[in-house]
Structures are given as structure tokens and as C-alpha cells.
Amino acid sequence: MGSVGLLGLLLLRLSVTASGSGAGTGSGTGSGTGTGTGQLVGSPATGPALQPREPLSYSRLQRKSLAVDFVVPSLFRVYARDLLLPPWSSSEPRAGWTEARGSLALDCAPLLRLLGPPPGVSWAEGASSPAPAQARTLTRVLKGGSVRKLRRAKQLVLELGEEAILEGCVGPSPEEVTAGLLQFNLSELFSWWIRHGEGRLRIRLMPEKKASAVGREGRLSAAIRASQPRLLFQILGTGHSSLESPTSLPSPPPDPFAWNLTWIMKDSFPFLSHRSRYGLECSFDFPCELEYSPPLHDLGNQSWSWRRVPSEEASQMDLLDGPETEHSKEMPRGSFLLLNTSANSKHTILSPWMRSSSEHCKLAVSVHRHLQPSGRYVAQLLPHNEPGREILLVPTPGKHGWTVLQGRIGRPENPFRVALEYISSGNRSLSAVDFFALKNCSEGTSPGSKMALQSSFTCWNGTVLQLGQACDFHQDCAQGEDEGQLCSQLPAGFYCNFENGFCGWSQGILTPHNPRWQVRTLKDARVQDHRGHALSLSTTDVPTSESATVTSATFPAPMKNSPCELRMSWLIHGVLRGNVSLVLVENKTGKEQSRMVWHVATNEGLSLWQWTVLPLLDVADRFWLQIVAWWGQGSRATVAFDNISISLDCYLTISGEEKMLQNTAPKSRNLFERNPNKDPRPWENTRETPVFDPTVHWLFTTCGASGPHGPTQAQCNNAYRNSNLSVVVGSEGPLKGIQTWKVPATDTYSISGYGAAGGKGGKNTMMRSHGVSVLGIFNLEKGDTLYILVGQQGEDACPSTNRLIQKVCIGENNVIEEEIRVNRSVHEWAGGGGGGGGATYVFKMKDGVPVPLIIAAGGGGRAYGAKTDTFHPERLENNSSVLGLNGNSGAAGGGGGWNDNTSLLWSGKSLLEGATGGHSCPQAMKKWGWETRGGFGGGGGGCSSGGGGGGYIGGNAASNNDPEMDGEDGVSFISPLGILYTPALKVMEGHGEVNIKHYLNCSHCEGDECHMDPESHKVICFCDHGTVLAEDGVSCIVSPTPEPHLPLSLVLSVVTSALVAALVLAFSGIMIVYRRKHQELQAMQMELQSPEYKLSKLRTSTIMTDYNPNYCFAGKTSSISDLKEVPRKNITLIRGLGHGAFGEVYEGQVSGVPSDPSPLQVAVKTLPEVCSEQDELDFLMEALIISKFNHQNIVRCIGVSLQALPRFILLELMAGGDLKSFLRETRPRPNQPSSLAMLDLLHVAQDIACGCQYLEENHFIHRDIAARNCLLTCPGPGRVAKIGDFGMARDIYRASYYRKGGCAMLPVKWMPPEAFMEGIFTSKTDTWSFGVLLWEIFSLGYMPYPSKSNQEVLEFVTSGGRMDPPKNCPGPVYRIMTQCWQHQPEDRPNFAIILERIEYCTQDPDVINTALPVEYGPLMEEEEKVPMRPQDPEGIPPLLVSPPQAKREEGPDPAAPPPLPSTSSGKAAKKPTAAELSGRVTRGPAVEGGHVNMAFSQSNPASELHKVQGSRNKPTSLWNPTYGSWFTEKPTKKNNPPATKGHHDRGNLGREGSCTVPPNVAAGRLPGASLLLEPSSLTASMKEVPLFRLRHFPCGNVNYGYQQQGLPFEGTTAPGSSQYEDALLKTPPGP
């Protein structure tokens, strides 16, 4: 922009201030992004009147500069037409259904703020943004000319003025604002251009051309930019929503052959105009684009804010040490900023938004430094959408007065602002600023703002996806339209799953013996997770070394700056002694350039399909892909590729900002060109060409420089003249003497840094302190800039050209020793210590901030009389959060660190201060000029003691000038970005070095060391001494050595004697051990077979139920004698059902029980013989608790058998299994309606409420009312629900489970707040749990509080949160739940009231006619794993159940909806029907982490029982490693009795504490009902366990884990595993 434009901008700002209105554009950007206190510099409150009109030529120039241009590239039209718009065809009329729409939209709020309210209308400031409404289309879209002419020109100019704003935003009625957007309808233009047009489409939006007051068009242009103009395009088909179609109209069905894509073009950074500046200079003599906080005041004496003060006025002020003359010498009379405050505050100067295209961009601020500063300056870099960072300000040398603070900004990727903060400390703080500039921020031409073209894909249900998510073989839309027929219509190669052939992939010239790529189905058993065809190559049939190449179709060039990606799945199965590469070949002009984008080299593949997404960067021409596989001898592998797709973003999306990308593609070492006329198979001989030359390395030296200052450019040019190095040496600032080097290629490099040695002392010239070496491995990318400072050796004290000093060196002058003898210290004759060695630094720049990679510390200087046995260990730091400080200085200087400041001349400087070496101590220079300076790299200067070495943390120097105290070495550093290859070692005796070379990966070698043969370019592994390389080239074997041969007779005699002796000793030992063990086993067996031995301690005492008053039955004492003893002879065990909390659970029969049929089917719970006393107490306690109850809704205890071992508890056999599994199994599904109705769920809830009422009336608190603890008599009609698990009540009954601070696991999701917060348990606790049980019943078995952990449930419930009703849950039922969940216990109803309300629900037609929710997905395990606590968590490690795998049920899988996403690695098993499961025992997965519920069956007739008993003589023994037990497995016959049909009515429940069931209901229970399974249960065989095997079962809670307080849960059973467990015998469950 010329001077006229700048003058116009200045007049525009003046007019905005004078008129008191504007667009609110801070810093001239037109977006109002400044701070709330922002104000333009030099904008007076009042100003002179301006001319009412401006020249036409000036107005036209200004209008052109303030326009907003939208340019859509012509390639977008070409690609959209070819990919999305198939030509019209009468045979395929669907192609004509595609529509193209377009519009240009602006927000009305900024435009209306500019105009102000119209006459008669008043709206508040917050109402300037009208409520959203249907966007209005302007009737006058185009200005001048015809549509035909504009189409021919492919350019549209839209002028926006007050009338258009009022028409589009306010409407015809000015009393009411109706539109939130102002839109131009461009559908006709865009539709013509996308189908028939040529070239690019350009749309220019500018202020209306009218003569008006100065600044009017500028304000209007700023308002237009603030309204965020954006261009919207849409290509859609019939049935899709449109940009302009009303949402209330019904849409026709979607077209599966038409796209629904949307594009939005807008400025990447709307707050930046195209006039964004790349530099700024403000001397405060004229108005500047700066903002202030607090605002600037030119008039008055505002002590709390900035003021612009002329220099002549400052000379008249009575300011303490204030500035009297202006810093700019070229202007004798000028102005500067002044701040005079007495408060502790922070004042800020903020720059406008800037950009930088140069690494040399810096901030320069001229301030006045006072003798006694009372504040400090801090600079902040504030990039867009990034956190700010501090800019290091370096002042010019000087004590006080005007000085320039400079800080490096660099080249930030995003636009940025710079804030200069002055932090005052009170006491009349004074600040003066004369100059504020951003310099050297432009490099070449400055690009304008970038328009981003963002694309999206809209699903049929309205879900919006990024365009890159479409056609990527991952279904994101609900109906899969993003992966449907649309993708199959793309050109060949864009979307390829190889189901219809090669998809455009082809091979070169094939011979009969050459391997070839094939499209086939993989039949290997290990890769059956993939179905369908794939592009595969087999190396099994090719014994020799070979290669194979397959080439894709040719793809057009992607859009410039597009996020282009390649997606593919690949697999390597077997042993591949070679590599596979994916090469991108770009068709450059006259040649083809190839580069590798993906590479894998492996010995043995994982045999798993892997998904890879590869960015395709910097592709500017047509390209194709090549898959190249090479293998050597011994390869037996299958290489396969599938689901290869090119993202549509490559051709239909444009990123707004042209990012300064380096090579961010995957590691690519091969970059070559070939002639298109040559053999089109360039990769056949690539194995013979080295990927890189391992002998090439880059050695960086000091370039011949020495002393405290680094080398110059001329020195390094001369030093590296005949080498492969090319460096740039800094000449000023902190980078002076630092060499910069660009990485030639993306690769892994080893960087060896060597610090410089320290100087020698005057008397000890035999040994110096060595520099430290550090070697690290780093991944570097092509174009990365490394900054390398090579440390220089500290200066030696001797020899010297000074004669007096030379005499001291050779021992002819002993003045130093004399002073030491007299004063015991050195002061007058100080000197003679060596300077500290400089450190070697290798670092990078990230956003202008140095980031260290490797720092090799320098050695400390030796003292004048240093001892020879001094040793300083190496120190290494790898934490960048540790401050890199300078070493402590005394008479000698400490070493320089990474980032610190020092004012001592003899101290070494830190890297950010320039890293120069320190001078000698002043006394040494003054007395005899003994100069022992520190080396470049932060070495400290010497005195009589040695100087400290440089490093990340500088080495310390002696504090008292001890002539025997050496300077300490610095601290080395390696970045966490790298890998430390060798530890820090002191090795360097001179100057430092840096050696960079390619790192050869030797991880496949046994010794992790290898080298590459320079002739054959093969990697050869090294072996340790005494071993040689095996034939496989990887392993090391001991080298065979010839041994002396002994006579054969002697060898035979020795071997025979040794064998006989060994056999005799072994036989004797076996006999002795066997006899001893046999005697021990006999004694133990006799002792264990005595029942009195185990019951002696139990018979002498009784168990009191008064431990917990809540469990007391009228305070009576219960003993073993109260239990009904059943003789062992009357008990017959039929088969094993599973493993319970104490031991095995069996199905059995008992006879001779009064008032019961004989034989009676029962469940027998066993207690193994070898048990702890605590287990016996638990076993008996549970028997006592269950025996106390006598109710039809509580599982009945038939009796016990305790007089013989093992001990038994006989319980009522429940064939229906647990309630939770029943609900989950009977969920209705689309192809499987449920046999349940809402009335069935109410009856189940009624049964459980009856049992709870009985417990409540007997003052018994269950504490764990949950669906998993309720059992059903049968799964069919007539079922009765009963409470069947009192494990938790048993533990609380024992008064040890709820001990404070223990490892107890509580059912948190079923507990009220007072229970888990205060430990209060009442009958209202069971009321709360019953409400959760109701939620489980009516959600059909879902886990309460879905997706919440126990901790989250605690916080949710205590904060007042409650669960939402389950799907299709009737309102009256949910009201019962909410009443049970009242926070105050007294507000919860008792079970009599709950029963009454459930009864009402059973009579309500609206409730019982409610349909159950339908499950549309496969059943997924949403249960949480419930770890349990053993009795002694400190002594017993957690034992987890690991049951054997069950066999899959044979038969075809039923039709099911598509699977839902799941994180479980297991697969859902087929769910058998009830008829199929009758008469067989099944196993289900551990869905509740240790609570695997029992399933019982009563379908075995008497004849079947005799068959089972008669077949015990031929068992098949199976060892169960989980429980250490033997099971006897025997196949059984399936008996499928028909289920009795019909639904029996339920009787009314009593309200007096006991619930009765009518006789007809009891008689209707199905005794032979089929077995109910877990949701994913598998079929298993019946098992029978002889009684004598029960003695060897372990006891205790072996299948429960526990958790120490504060530790995470351990995993339980593996997915898909199964086990048995008795729901009656479970220990207290977890949530």
C-alpha cells in the first residue's frame, strides 16, 4: 500500500475517534480482538472537523484494499464434477437428482452495531444480535450487468450498504429485528459454475460505492470483516437437508447414490486483514497501532496510566532520576511514554496482531534505566490459540540511562501479539519508553490471508462428519451411508477392498518363475479375523531371494495445502527375512520422482491386521503408489493389503494457513529419480544400494578458535573447506560463535558431544581435568536446524611469555609459596590456577526458545598447587525442569550454565548470555598479568584456584581462593527426547567436539552391536570375545575348540560307574522319601477322619446372635444343636453344580425328611475337610441364619449334616437360577420376543417385597437386596422369586466385615448414603436397596448407575443425584423407586406400604399393558468386575478364578442386527433356547467378577439317576488347576420334557407381615422346567464328583480377589471364560 493508502488509514482512525462510533476494531484488524481496555495510540478525544467528501480516486483505492475476496480454485470444480457429479444419463436418472446450492452469509450483529437502531426502534446493547430466524435472501443480489455476463466472467462483485443491511437484517418492519444472518443467494451461480463453468470462481464483497464522509467505507469494511463473512456451498441429493430448505417441510427418502456434502470458505484468521503487518516501529511521535492497559491519557496528570510526554515537558518535571532528553538522536524534539505510579501494579503495552516469516524477528524496546530501579520489564509472546511464553530481554551494556531491551521472537507458526509489561513495586515507580519496534520479521514477499475451505459429510439422520471420515472403511453414520454405494462409484483405486478384482492395481512383466501378487481369500487359521478378499503375496514357494512390485492406478494431483491421507490395512504372517515398502511416485515434468512413505522390516510378523494412516504431503503432480516386497532365503511369509483408500480431503478440502511444514512424513531414506523410458521396476535392486552410507559422519570442531570467544564464519569456512560440512556461524547476540547446521535427511542419528578440558595449574602441569562425553540417539527430520556450540579448552597457567610468570612455572620464583606460608592464603600474588573448560551444547529452536538436546560438560580448571589424586565424578541431568544455573564464583569464576545471569567478569557466561569464558581474577591481572581465562562454552576464569567448567549447570569455584582447590566440572545434560547410549565419561584432553552420524539399529543382534560392511552394505552383528556369529547372522555361539581325546575304555568305565552310583542313590532316596511321606499321610488321614476332632471346639461353645442388634431374633442364643441334623446315609449326591464360597455345590436327593416328599431334590453345599476355624464359623453361621427363616419367598434350609466329614448344608433346589441372569436372558429382541410381560416383572417384585417384609417384621437387616441374590423356582410361568443369599449378612453378623480401615468391599450401588458414609444400617437400608432392585428388574438386568464407578456413585448419590427411570418403565413403578431413594431414612416407606403400591400397579391397566423395551444389539457384558476380600488380606495373595474354556454350542447362528462397538475382546456366544437347555448343566461367563450364579435343574427322572450311579466305575478324570481338584466327567443323555404352558393368576399378598401364595399357584410351578443360563453361556458336560475326592478340595474364598485400600482393582476372569458358583454361598458382593 502506498503513502496515499497509509494516509487514508490514518484519517479513517481519526474519523472513527472523532465521531465516537466505530466497528470496534482493535489494532486495525476489524474484528475487535483487543482487550477491554485497548485503545489506539495517539487517538485524541477530540479532533478537527474533516472534509465531508473525499476524492473519487482515493475512495476507489481504499475500497479495493478493504474488500473481502473469496477465490475458489478451478481444481475444486474439476474434482467436484468428476468425483461427485456423474453426467446426466437417461438410463441412470438418479444422476440428475444431485443439486448444487450456494450462499454468502454474514452475522447481522456487527453490521447493526455500525448503523445503530433505526428511528422508532430501541434495542439494548446485548440485543444487537437478533434472535436466530430463517435467513432472509436479498432480492437485489447482483449490482449491475447481466447474469450471463457475470457467468462468462466467473467473477461476482457484491456491494453492501446501509439499505442492504436494513433489508437483510431488519426487514420491512423496522420495529422488529427478525434475522440473525444476512445472506446472498448464490445457488444459481454456483450450480452453473460447478457443472459448466471454467476457471476459478471469485466473489468480492466490498462496501457500497457512495460518496460520503471520510471513514464511512472504512468503518463499513471493518464491520463486514467483524461479521465473519463465509461462503457456503452444498452438493446434495433428493431427501437431504438443504442450506435454504425449511426444516418444517417433510423430506423425501434419501438417495443412496447422491452425496450430501457441505463446504464453508472463510478466513483462517478472521481478525487479520490482508494488510497484516510484518513489522512495526513506533517512536510515539505519531499515532501508533498499540493498545494500553490502563488506557493512554494524553491530557491531564493521570498517575495511574500511561502518558505521552514531549521531551521539553519532561525537562520541566520534578522527577526522581527521570529522563530529560529523548532517545532518538535524529529528532531533537520528540515524545515518549511515561508512567509514574506509587501502587504495586502491572501496566501493559500490547502490539497489534503480527506475523513473522523470518527466524531473525526480534523485539526492540528503548527504556530508561534508573540508578535505583523500582520496577521491571517483562515481555510476553502471545500466539493465536496457543499459550503465551516469556521473551528473554537482553539489555545493552551500561549502568543506567537510556538502554535498548532486545528479545528474540523467531518464526511462530500462528499470528501473534507482543505484550510489554511493566511491573511496579510501589514507592513512586517510574517508567519511560521511547521506542517500541518489531524488526526483521519479514523474509521475502509477505503472503496475504488464507481462505480455508472446510468440508463435511452429512448422514441421513443429520450427523455431520468430517469429509475425511467418509469412504475410509470405518462406518460412522448410523445406517452406513458414509461407506455405502457412494464410495463404490469413485474412480478406480480411490476406495478398494479387492472384492471385485485388483481395483486398478497392476503388476509389471511377469515370468513363470517370478512371484506374483494375487487377490484371494486368506485361509490361514491364524488370520480368520479377516473375511473377504485381499491383495496378498506368498514367499513360501520361492526359496531364493526375490522381490515383487504391484502398482496402483494413477491419481490426480491433490489440492495445494490439503490434508491428504492414505488409509490401508496390512498384515504379515509368518517369517519374512526382508522388508515391505510403500513408495509414492510423482510424475514430475520430464522425470519421475519417488519417495518412500511407509516401510516395515520384520523377522516374524504378528499375524494381525493393522490399520495405518499415512499423510501424503507436498504432492504437487499426478502420482501413483507402488508396494514393493523384498525377501531373502528362508522367508516363509504371507504379505497382504486390504481396504486401501485415498481420502476425499485430498481433492475437496483446503487448509487455510499454509503451514511451514518440514518433512513430517514417515521416515524415508530412499529418495531417487528414474527415467520413464527405463525399466519400470526400479525397486528390484534396491537391496544392493545402501539406504545410507554408514561411514559418513559430520565432525564439528572449534574451527581453530581458542580462548573465551567462539569462532567466526571465516574460520569455519577454512576449517571445513575439504569436508562435507557447511555451517553458518552467528556473528552477534547470544548466538555469536555458535554453528548452525541443517539435517540433510530424516533419520535416526547418534550425536556425540565432547566437552572441553580445563586448564592446567602452575605447579601441576602433568594432568588436566578432562571434558565429559555424552552420546545420545535422536530422531531428526530433514531441514531441522541444529545449533552447535563446541566448547573450547580453558587456558593453562603455564608456560607463559611473561618472564616473571615463567620463573614461577619452572620453580625459580616461590613468592606464592612464601605468602601461603606466612598468611596461609593467597591474595597479593593471586594467580596460577587454570581456566575452566567450556561445555559443548547441541540444541534446537522451538518457537524461538532454545531446547537443549545434548550438553557435554567442560572440565574444571586445576588449581595452582592441585593434588594429583583429585577426582570429581561425572554428573548427568535429564530433567529440563531443573534450572540451568551458573556455578558459584569466588576469587575464581564459576562455570556458566544454560540460562542464568551474572555480572562478574571472571565468571563464565550462560548459553543465553553468549557462553563466553570468564576473565582471570582482577588481582592476578593487576599484580603480574597472569591471564588464565575460561574456554568458550561458559568456562570460568582462574585465580589461584581453578575456574569452574561450563555445563547445563556450571561448576563451582572455590570460595576462598584456595590454591589447592580445583574448579568443579559442569553438569552434563541429555534431553528426554533422546536415548542415552553411553553414560557420561571424562575423556577429552583438549577442545570439545561434536560428532553426528547415522545410527545403525542393531536391536536384532544378540549383542545389540553391529556394523555395516562398506562393500556389500550388509549389516553384520558383533559378538563378544570367545563367541562367533551363527549361520542366522543374529545369534552368537561359542566357538568350537578342539579337546584332547581320552581313551575309550577309560571313558566307558567312568560313565558306567557314575551311572550305577547315581541309580543306587536315586532309588535309595526315593524309597526313604516315599516311606516318610506315607507315614505322614496315614497319620494325617486318621486324624482328619475323626469328626470329633474338628467339631470339638464348636460343640463346647455356642454362637450368640447379639453381636449386631440388627440381626437379633428376640435376643435368643443359637447353637449347633438347633439345626436339623440329617443322617449322612439319607443323602445321595447326583452331580456337581459348581464351586461356591466354601467348597463344591452338588445336586442331590435326601430322604426321610418329615413333611417333605421323599426323595427330595436339594442343593448340597459342602465344607472341605481341611479348613480354617474361621471358615467353619462362617459355614455354620450361614446355616444358622438361613434356618431361622420360614417364608415362601426365602430359600428354605432343609437341614445340615455336620456329624461326618465333609460337612453339608441342604438347601431348597432353585431350578430357575438367579434373577439377574433370568432378566438378561429374557430381554426382548427384534427376532426373539420375550416370554415376559410387565405383569411378570411386577409379580417378581411382589415376591421379593414379601420376603423383605418378613425380614423387616423380624427385625433382620439383609444389607444386600439385589437381583443377583434372588433366585427363581423355575424359568417358566408360575415362577416364584426368593431371597437366597445371606453371605453379606453372615459377615456383618460376625462383626468383622465392616471394620474401619479394612479391605471390605461394599455393594456401594445398592447402599444409601447413611450406610457408606456413617455405617448406619436399619430396615430403611433394605428399602433403598429394594428401590435399586426394582430398577434392575424393570431395566431387565442392567447394571445400576451405568458407566459410573463406585467413587462416582458415592459422589453422585451424596450430592442428591438419582437414576433416571429405565426405558419403558411405568410412572407408578418409578415413583416407588424414588420413594425408596429418599435421602432421609424416615421418609422411605416400609415394605407393607411398598407391597400395597405394587398391588395397585398390578391392577392398573396402563401399567400392565406397557411393552417391554426391545434390545437391538448383541448382548454385551456391561457388568463390573467385583473383587472380594479374603479373611487375611496381608497373608494371602488374591486368587482369581480362571475356569476352563467351554465348548461353543453347535448350530447355525441366528440372524442378529449388526454388532455394536465393544471394547471386549471376547465374542458373544449363541444363546440357546429354553428347550435346548433342559436337562443339561451349562456354564456362563463371570459377569460379576466372582459372582457366577448357580443354575439348578429338577428334570432328571429316577431312571436317569440310576444310570448316573451305575456308571461311576468308568470315570474320565479331568484335573482342575484352578481349585486343585479332580472331577469325574461322564457324558449324559439330554432329557427335554415339554414345558407346561399357561399363566396362573397370583393371589393377593397379605398385609400382616406374611405373604401367602394360593395353592393353585404353588401347584402350577413347573418341577421340570428347563435350566436358565447366563447371557453368553456355553454348553458343558455333566460332572460327577465322588465323595472321597472332597477331602482334597481347598477351602475359603479362593475365587475372590481383594483390594488393599487405595489400590486399583486387578483383572478377574478373561473374556469368554466361564465357571460355576452357588448364588447362595457367595461372599458379600461388590457393586
UniProtKB/Swiss-Prot annotation:
Glycans are attached at residues 185, 260, 301, 340, 427, 440, 461, 579, 587, 643, 724, 823, 878-879, 901, 1001. The EGF-like region drives the cytokine specificity for ALKAL2. The gene is ALK. Residues 1-18 form the signal peptide. Activated upon ALKAL2 ligand-binding. ALKAL2-driven activation is coupled with heparin-binding. Following ligand-binding, homodimerizes and autophosphorylates, activating its kinase activity. Inactivated through dephosphorylation by receptor protein tyrosine phosphatase beta and zeta complex (PTPRB/PTPRZ1) when there is no stimulation by a ligand. Residues 1002-1040 are annotated as: EGF-like. Its EC number is 2.7.10.1. It is found in: Cell membrane. GO terms for cellular component: plasma membrane; receptor complex. Its main location: membrane. One of its GO terms (biological process) is adult behavior. This is ALK tyrosine kinase receptor. Homodimer; homodimerizes following heparin- and ligand-binding. Interacts with CBL, IRS1, PIK3R1 and PLCG1. Interacts with FRS2 and SHC1. Interacts with PTN and MDK.
